[in-house]
């Protein structure tokens, strides 16, 4: 295994853990799309505190995960 693969596995596990932590918070957070809940994506929500931090962290991790995936795909 290359170092980039290990980093991607760790990031994927972190994203899953954060998604599971956010899944009990409303219908817009976490893994709501997988559980069949109604998604209210364009509704304004006032998330504060740890929920907001987890949402931003998950967004950043997913973007980095996609970038690393593209780099890994085109590098080999």
From Swiss-Prot:
It is a multi-pass membrane protein. The gene is secG. The keyword Transmembrane helix applies. GO terms for cellular component: plasma membrane. It comes from the Bacteria. The chain crosses the membrane at residues 3-23, 56-76. The keyword Chloroplast does not apply. GO terms for molecular function: protein-transporting ATPase activity. Keywords: Cell membrane, Membrane, Protein transport, Translocation, Transmembrane, Transmembrane helix, Transport. Involved in protein export. Participates in an early event of protein translocation. It is found in: Cell membrane. One of its GO terms (biological process) is protein secretion. The lineage of its organism: Bacteria, Bacillati, Mycoplasmatota, Mycoplasmoidales, Mycoplasmoidaceae. Its main location: membrane. It comes from Mycoplasma pneumoniae (strain ATCC 29342 / M129 / Subtype 1) (Mycoplasmoides pneumoniae). This is Probable protein-export membrane protein SecG. InterPro entries: SecG.
């Amino acid at each position: 295994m290359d170092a980039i693969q290990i980093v991607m596995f760790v990031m994927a596990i972190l994203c899953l853990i954060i998604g599971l932590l956010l899944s009990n918070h409303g219908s817009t957070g976490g893994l709501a799309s997988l559980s069949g809940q109604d998604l209210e994506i364009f509704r304004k929500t006032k998330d504060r505190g740890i929920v907001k931090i987890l949402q931003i962290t998950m967004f950043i991790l997913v973007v980095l995960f996609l970038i690393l995936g593209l780099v890994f795909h085109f590098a080999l």
